[in-house]
Structure formats: structure tokens, C-alpha cells
Swiss-Prot record:
Encapsidates the genome in a ratio of one protein N per nine ribonucleotides, protecting it from nucleases. If expressed without protein P it binds non-specifically RNA and therefore can bind it's own mRNA. Interaction with protein P abolishes any non-specific RNA binding, and prevents phosphorylation. The soluble N-P complex encapsidates specifically the genomic RNA, with protein N protecting the genome like a pearl necklace. The encapsidated genomic RNA is termed the nucleocapsid (NC) and serves as template for viral transcription and replication. Keywords: Capsid protein, Helical capsid protein, Host cytoplasm, Phosphoprotein, Ribonucleoprotein, RNA-binding, Superantigen, Viral nucleoprotein, Virion. Displays a superantigen activity in human and mouse, activating mostly V-beta-8 subtypes of T-cell receptor. This is Nucleoprotein. It is found in: Virion; Host cytoplasm. It holds the Pfam family Rhabdo_ncap. Homomultimerizes to form the nucleocapsid. Binds to viral genomic RNA. In nucleocapsid, binds protein P and thereby positions the polymerase on the template. Protein P acts as a chaperone on free protein N to prevent it from aggregation before encapsidating genomic RNA. The modification Phosphoserine is found at S389.
């Protein structure tokens, strides 16, 4: 009999069937570039920069911008940001630049142009008869790219936060080396007319190009990154959370994964560490793969590795981390089971550390310390006859080895202990819970637990 089938009767008739549910029809696409071709973008005819500046500035003052014109201008304005490449720059086998080369953001990608003219409305810009200066172009580019960051701020009760961010960014682009080109609050007013621009592929692409450039090249106008920094590791919340997690608990990625006691982690860990990706290469195209269009469905997002994401943030909640308490639970990825494992791992790594002397007054003191430690190790390895030495890690209350933690979970029947629940309630009840957050989940799940 097929193990996936079930048997039952309907009106005395024997029925045998295989229950099937809706599965994820999307295929995760890895960002590795196989053909050694730079990411490309197609835009309209390159504009006259003076005309484009006047038109875009006029549109910003009127809170009415054409996204195609904005993208065409942003690509053309890259000529103002020439910098020196500090080292040979290679990614996925593509030679981007050599050390000492003078480069602009355009060197990172292939920008193709058609003969299609832009709209370039002149209304409202007649007062500017001279050519705009480089600081004026830099200020306009910076303000336009700030629209990307503002459009990425979503969620409830973000009104004041978004306004404050917009005001701070405006202040950056009205002080040296930039110059003031718009009135106060213009950025926020314009954003309201462009609230979804982060979903426009060409605009997102150009924001990623500028960010990748300024993240490596020291430049007078590097503050432009204030609007584009959100393109770095975009749709990588799962991988970023895992990286933050292993640093917090002071383990290597290999050692941390040994504590992931659940079969649903297998596919996610395989997905996160797919060979051939440049996840650990500085200044790689990987960092901006989402904005550069290298992956339609990220294999590194919180939804792609939901069990891992849930576990990491339950551990974070146990440790009282606000970021974890505010994060959104992936409801389809066993949050109840992950909260149990998170409690045990939180207990192991919260309020405890592994310490040893590393600095000494002189070489003799160092040698004496090493000799004393060696003696302690020899004594510890001696079998006292009460417990099989191979099993000591399983039963010792002082060890935090994966085997010991797993044994404690099994001895408790895979259930949280009273102390775990008390800790979860303590951290979540003192936090203003956002809808669907980990804090809300813990409050609803364990607040009424009578254990």
C-alpha cells in the first residue's frame, strides 16, 4: 500500500486516495550570472542634461513626475559621479574595473538606449537659463533616489516616521557639498504621488546601480546612498537574519545549524547555501541582485526560509530583542514548533557565555596558564566510572552542545518548560505588539498557559 494514501468508506464503499494540497508553484531563481554579461536595462533616448534637469525639477515642484523621464535622467546623470576604483573589481567572472580606473556607476551595467524621445515638459523651469552645476545635479539625483527609500517604508503607523525620514534626507541635500534646490517638504509631497515607485523595475534597477557604486567608491557625493541603501540585500531577510543570529550567539554557520532539530530546515538550509552564489563576496552583484533583476523570486527571503526565520526570531524574542519582537511571523511555517525550539535555544544562549583568559602580563604567565588548563583537561577526561564518558555531554547541565540540548528537549517531551513560557510572557507582555508580530503571537499563545 502506498504510504501517501488513506483508506476509508463512503456509504459502505471502500475509497482509497492520496490527499494533495496546493503547493508553491513558483520556482526560486538564484542570482548567479552564468553568461558573464552585465545586468542590462533599456531606456529611451538619452536627454540633454540641462533640459532634463529643468523638466525633472519642475515636475518635482509640481509633485508630478514621469517615471520614464526620471529613469532616463538618472542614467544620463551618472557622468557626474566619476570616481577611482580602489581595487580590481570582479563579480561572477565579470571584470567590472581595474584598480585605478576612473569609473562612473554606468560601468556596472549595460545601459541600452532606444530612439524614443522623453516628454521633458519645460513648464515651471524657465527661470533657469544657465547650465545646472554638478552640485545641483547631485542634489536632484539624491532627492529622486530618496523616493525609492520612502516607497519601501510600509506598514501601519508609519506616517510620522516617514515624514521625519523625508525631512532628514531633505536636509542632507541642501547642505554642502549639495545645494538646496527645492522648498521644505517637497520630497514628502512628491513621494505621495510616487508611493509605489519601488515596484517600477527600471527605477529599482537604477537605485541598485547607484548604491552598488557608492558602497565601494569613495566620493564627494556618497551621501546619495541615503536613498538607495535599502537595495542592498533586498528580499534577503532570511539570509540576513541568519547572519545576524550566528553573530549574536557567537557561533559559526556550521555550528549553529547543528541546533536546528527539525526536518523542515533541510530544504531551507540547502536553499540558502546553494553553491555558486557570491553570498560572502564583498561588492558582488549578489548584494543587489533583486534590484538588478537577477532573481524574480528570491530564495533568501523570509518566506523562502520561513522555518529558519521563525526560529531565529523566537530565539531573539527570548533574548528580549526588539527587532525580533516586531518581526512578522511566517504563519505557514510551524510557528508553534519553532517557538518550542526557540525557547530551548534561547535558554542556552541567553545570559551565558564562554570565557577564557587571552591576555597575559608576560610569556611565563601565559605558559603557566596553558599548563594549568592542560591539567584540567586531563582530569576532566578521566572516567569516574559513574557515567559512560561518551554520554557525558548528553546529561551535563553545564554543556550547550547540540547533543545536550536535543536530549533536554526529548526529556521534556518536545514541550516548553514553565521557565521558558514565563520568559516568553515576560518579554512579550512588556512590548507594544504590532499585528502579526512575534510579540503578538507569544502573547496570544502563552499568556493563558497554566503550566
Amino acid at each position: 500500500m502506498d504510504s501517501d494514501r488513506i483508506v476509508f468508506k463512503v456509504h459502505n464503499q471502500l475509497v482509497s486516495l492520496k490527499p494533495e494540497v496546493i503547493s508553491d508553484q513558483y520556482e526560486y531563481k538564484y542570482p548567479a550570472i552564468d553568461d558573464k554579461k552585465k545586468p542590462s536595462i533599456t531606456l529611451g533616448k538619452a536627454p540633454d542634461l540641462k533640459t532634463a534637469y529643468k523638466s525633472i525639477l519642475s515636475g518635482m515642484n509640481a509633485a508630478k513626475l514621469d517615471p520614464d523621464d526620471v529613469c532616463s535622467y538618472l542614467a544620463a546623470a551618472m557622468v557626474f559621479f566619476e570616481g577611482i576604483c580602489p581595487e580590481d573589481w570582479t563579480s561572477y567572472g565579470i571584470n567590472i574595473a581595474k584598480k585605478g580606473d576612473k569609473i562612473t556607476p554606468a560601468v556596472l551595467v549595460d545601459i541600452q538606449r532606444t530612439n524614443t524621445e522623453g516628454n521633458w515638459a519645460q513648464a515651471g523651469g524657465q527661470d533657469l537659463t544657465r547650465d545646472p552645476t554638478t552640485p545641483e545635479h547631485a542634489s536632484l539625483v539624491g532627492l529622486l533616489l530618496c523616493l525609492y527609500r520612502l516607497s519601501k517604508i510600509v506598514g501601519q503607523n508609519t506616517g510620522n516616521y516617514k515624514t521625519n525620514v523625508a525631512e532628514r534626507m531633505e536636509q542632507i541635500f541642501e547642505t554642502a557639498p549639495f545645494v538646496k534646490i527645492v522648498e521644505h517638504h517637497t520630497l514628502m509631497t512628491t513621494h505621495k504621488m510616487c508611493a509605489n515607485w519601488s515596484t517600477i523595475p527600471n527605477f529599482r534597477f537604477l537605485a541598485g546601480v547607484y548604491d552598488m557604486f557608492f558602497s565601494r567608491i569613495e566620493h564627494l557625493y556618497s551621501a546619495i546612498r541615503v536613498g538607495t541603501v535599502v537595495t542592498a540585500y533586498e528580499d534577503c531577510s532570511g539570509l540576513v537574519s541568519f547572519t545576524t543570529f550566528i553573530r549574536q550567539i557567537n557561533l559559526t554557520a556550521r555550528d549553529a545549524v547543528l541546533y536546528f532539530f527539525h526536518k523542515n530546515f533541510e530544504e531551507e538550509i540547502k536553499r540558502m547555501f546553494e553553491p555558486g552564489q557570491e553570498t560572502a563576496v564583498p561588492h558582488s552583484y549578489f548584494i543587489h541582485f533583486r534590484s538588478l533583476g537577477l532573481s524574480g523570486k528570491s530564495p533568501y527571503s523570509s518566506n523562502a526560509v520561513g522555518h529558519t526565520f521563525n526560529l531565529i526570531h523566537f530565539v531573539g524574542c527570548y533574548m528580549g530583542q526588539v527587532r525580533s519582537l516586531n518581526a512578522t511571523v511566517i504563519q505557514s511555517c510551524a510557528p508553534h514548533e519553532m517557538s518550542v525550539l526557540g525557547g530551548y535555544l534561547g535558554e542556552e544562549f541567553f545570559g551565558r557565555g564562554t570565557f577564557e583568559r587571552r591576555f597575559f602580563r608576560d610569556e611565563k604567565e601565559l605558559q603557566d596558564y596553558e599548563a594549568a588548563e592542560a591539567t584540567k583537561i586531563d582530569l576532566a577526561l578521566e572516567d569516574d566510572g559513574t557515567v559512560n564518558s561518551d554520554d557525558e555531554d548528553f546529561f551535563s547541565g553545564e554543556t550547550r552542545s547540540p547533543e545536550a540540548v536535543y536530549s533536554r528537549i526529548m526529556m521534556s517531551g518536545g514541550r516548553l518548560k514553565k521557565s521558558h513560557i514565563k520568559r516568553y510572557i515576560s518579554v512579550s507582555s512588556n512590548h507594544q505588539a504590532r499585528p502579526n508580530s512575534f510579540a503578538e503571537f507569544l502573547n496570544k499563545t502563552y499568556a493563558s498557559d497554566t503550566r
